[in-house]
Every structure is written in C-alpha cells, then in structure tokens.
C-alpha cells in the first residue's frame, strides 16, 4: 500500500481515510532457472536436532528483474488510466516456493529424476514435491505438486 518502512499514527490515519480508494495489484512471473541457485547444508551450524541447517543461494536472473520492472510500469499505467494518483513499487514478497533442487530431466547428467518422479540413480525412489520442477510458472504450484504423486506408479 505504501513505501516499505512506513508506520505510525499519520500513516495509519492516511490508510484509514483513503482505504475505500485503495487498490493493490499482485504481479507474478516465472523465475528463470539458474544452475548456480541451490540449497546446500551448512558446514558447521546445526539445528535443534543436531542436523546441518540448509543454506539457500538464490540470484535473480536478469530477465526476472526486467520482468518485474515491466510489471511495475504496466501496473502503474493501469492505475493511472483508472484515475489513480499514487503508485508504489514494493519489493518482492519475501516468501518463495523452493523449486528445482531435484530437477526433472531426461538423464542423470542433467537432473535427479525423470517425468514420473522416479530417480535416475536409485531404484524405486520417487520425488513427489516441487523440487523436481526446473522452474516455476506464474501460478502457485500447490495443485501440480499434489498431482505428481497421483500419477506415480
């Protein structure tokens, strides 16, 4: 609704007074797959059970940034055409659907499992979550994730 970090009595008053004239737009696009994005295990840090904690490494692809900037421009144009007077470009939502850590591929050199989720190297082991997706679509992946194990032998 407003710039990040905005808070306090004046902000609250402005939001409440203008609430009936506010709108929000959520624009979602595909994150391009990158081989260097990964989840590894920390060398020394452990969780409460003594297991290594995960370390997520994620860099945005230049197309991701270009797509976001395009969405900001087009979203602002929609609001301006509707008579809006203010638009704010908020940072990306800090939540993700982690995908691609056990990528689906035609062979073991390029990924972990095949189209049915069966792993290339370990017989009768199936990947049944979003980690087999090579990339994410512009929609929430939950229904597709639920469908994956239904089609597994």
Q: What are these language model-derived features?
A:
Residues 75-82, 148-153:
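Internal hydrophobic alpha-helix adjacent to the cofactor/substrate pocket in enzyme cavities
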Residues 85-119:
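Active-site Gly/Thr loop motif
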Residues 1-54, 110, 120, 127-134:
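FAD cofactor-binding and catalytic pocket of flavoenzymes
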Residues 67, 96, 116-120, 129, ...:
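Secondary-structure capping and boundary motifs in well-ordered enzyme cores
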Residues 53-61:
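Conserved FAD/dinucleotide-binding core of flavoprotein oxidoreductases
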Residues 135-153:
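A conserved FAD-binding loop/helix module that cradles the flavin
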């Amino acid at each position: 609704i407003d710039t990040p970090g905005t808070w306090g009595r004046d902000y609250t008053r402005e939001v409440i007074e203008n609430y009936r004239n506010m709108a929000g737009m959520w624009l979602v696009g595909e994150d391009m797959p990158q081989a260097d994005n990964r989840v590894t295990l920390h060398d020394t840090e452990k969780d409460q059970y003594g297991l290594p904690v995960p370390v997520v490494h994620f860099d945005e692809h230049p197309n991701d940034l270009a797509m976001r900037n395009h969405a900001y421009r087009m979203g602002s144009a929609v609001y301006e055409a509707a008579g809006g007077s203010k638009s704010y470009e908020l940072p990306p939502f800090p939540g993700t659907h982690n995908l691609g850590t056990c990528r689906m591929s035609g062979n073991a050199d390029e990924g972990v499992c095949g189209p049915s989720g069966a792993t290339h190297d370990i017989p009768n082991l199936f990947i049944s979550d979003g980690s087999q997706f090579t990339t994410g679509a512009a929609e929430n992946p939950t229904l597709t994730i639920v469908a994956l194990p239904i089609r597994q032998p």
